[in-house]
A protein has these predicted regions:
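Membrane-embedded alpha-helical bundles that constitute the cytochrome b-like, heme-associated redox core
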Residues: 1-241
Length: 241
């Protein structure tokens, strides 16, 4: 009970839920990046228009999507949803508490002047709201077309992920919105990565500098992979490659 009611406990839960979501993002980015690899092998365009090739399971991205349909992942979906809800709830609560304590719209509590000077550290709440809004936008494009019909029989099911990628990213303005979202995600992750280690007590000056660098690298890998997927799908959908 103390873990969920005390200030330190809430920060700990926020950090752990954040770590869980980072692992998910790494897996999600990796599987989606398979579609970019398929472009270089010539399988993306072929599988996107040939149902026979698609049914044969050709393409790394198709294999990755098949993995995401396994019973293990089906069990993990509600756990993932819970992780998001916990992270959103405690993130909002901590931000509200900080604003109330400081008497104004003050952002995340940070441990040092250097951290306080970071734009992302000061604007974690705003970044979180932007990311949450785009998650809802993103779910209408993919989850609502694949998992939702499969799990609940709602909507039209699209079983070819290549076709779905093309349909979503064919419009340039959708691509731009997603790139903006990935930028917000990058800023959120660069601060969130090292702060989750600080939350669990790993806050030595030497290691904190290293963790900030590692955080930038991890955030860059995740977000650049997503950007590559979106740009590649736009180029494929418009027959530019």
């Amino acid at each position: 009970m103390a873990l969920s009611t005390s200030s330190i406990g809430k920060k700990f839960i926020q950090g752990i839920s954040g770590a869980f979501l980072i692992v998910f993002l790494l897996l999600h980015a990796t599987i989606n990046f398979f579609s970019v690899i398929d472009s270089f092998t010539g399988k993306y365009g072929a599988v996107a228009v040939d149902d026979k090739l698609f049914s044969m399971g050709d393409g790394l991205f198709k294999l990755g999507c098949d993995f995401m349909s396994t019973p293990f992942i089906s069990i993990m979906v509600p756990i993932l949803a819970l992780g998001f809800l916990v992270h959103i709830f405690y993130g909002g609560w901590l931000s509200w508490r900080n604003m109330k304590a400081r008497g104004g719209f003050k952002r995340y509590e940070v441990a040092s002047k250097a951290a306080a000077d970071s734009w992302s550290a000061k604007n974690m709440l705003i970044l979180g709201i932007v990311i949450l809004g785009f998650i809802c936008f993103h779910l209408t494009h993919f989850w609502a077309k694949m998992q939702l019909p499969e799990m609940f029989g709602i909507g039209t099911y699209e079983d070819n992920p290549y076709v779905l990628l093309n349909a979503v990213f064919a419009k340039w303005w959708v691509l731009v919105l997603y790139v903006v979202w990935f930028g917000a995600l990058f800023l959120h992750l660069t601060h969130g990565f090292w702060s989750m280690f600080q939350t669990v007590g790993w806050s030595g000056q030497i290691w904190m500098k290293r963790l900030k660098v590692i955080g930038v690298i991890v955030a860059a890998i995740i977000c650049l992979a997503f950007v590559a997927v979106a740009v590649n799908a736009f180029l494929q959908a418009n027959a530019l490659i």
